[in-house]
């Protein structure tokens, strides 16, 4: 999810890359699951996240919806999936009674990154540390790449950039639509193209093939 922020108010004033050391270490969140309990409907999922969740739960996109794991919402005119919260008291549905994540190895990029955020500019992005988000005391230095724990991180970060700026283009075209039917058709196409069709084992190859097809359509 995008936010308008003042970096000086929410961060330590630095911008990071994945090779930098950042004060994030928290002993694997031992005794704490605060960020998973107070979360709101703001964990927007990208195609990689959906692919990972489908693998973890051995299901497909429709299964995630029917199983109450995700919901759809409109973000800047684009319909996108987000994690669904527990009914009533809220919190992540993947948090177990011991305060641990049931899908930790497959968790979404937002969860992996927290309490880091991303700032996009000039076709690229860098990370920033949200200093008021994580209450865990006495954090230690850790390399951001290790904190993220994502295989083939360079490919993943390129995907993140390409997906972000593709969505920006889609948002612009949706906002310029001359009638209500055009956004409906585009959103249905995007859901089918990037989320409903399984990715299999070769996620990046499949994603970029679909991205090329979508670029030609839009």
Language-model features, listed with the residues they occupy:
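Short loop/turn segments that flank or connect secondary-structure elements
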Residues: 1-218
């Amino acid at each position: 999810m995008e936010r308008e922020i003042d970096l000086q108010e929410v961060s330590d004033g630095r911008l990071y890359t994945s090779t930098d050391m950042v004060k994030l270490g928290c002993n694997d969140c031992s005794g704490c699951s605060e960020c998973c309990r107070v979360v709101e409907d703001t964990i927007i999922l990208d195609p990689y996240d959906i692919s990972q969740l489908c693998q973890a739960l051995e299901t497909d996109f429709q299964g995630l919806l029917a199983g109450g794991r995700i919901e759809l919402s409109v973000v800047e005119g684009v319909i996108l999936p987000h994690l669904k919260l527990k009914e009533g008291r809220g919190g992540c549905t993947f948090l177990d009674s011991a305060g641990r994540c049931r899908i930790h190895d497959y968790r979404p990029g937002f969860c992996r990154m927290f309490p880091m955020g991303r700032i996009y500019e000039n076709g690229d992005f860098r990370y920033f540390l949200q200093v008021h988000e994580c209450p865990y005391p006495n954090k230690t230095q850790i390399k951001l790449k290790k904190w993220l724990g994502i295989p083939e991180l360079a490919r993943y970060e390129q995907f993140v950039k390409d997906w972000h700026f593709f969505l920006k283009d889609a948002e612009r075209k949706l906002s310029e639509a001359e009638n209500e039917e055009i956004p409906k058709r585009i959103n249905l196409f995007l859901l089918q193209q990037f989320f409903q069709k399984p990715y299999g084992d070769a996620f990046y190859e499949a994603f970029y093939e679909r991205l090329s097809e979508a670029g030609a359509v839009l």
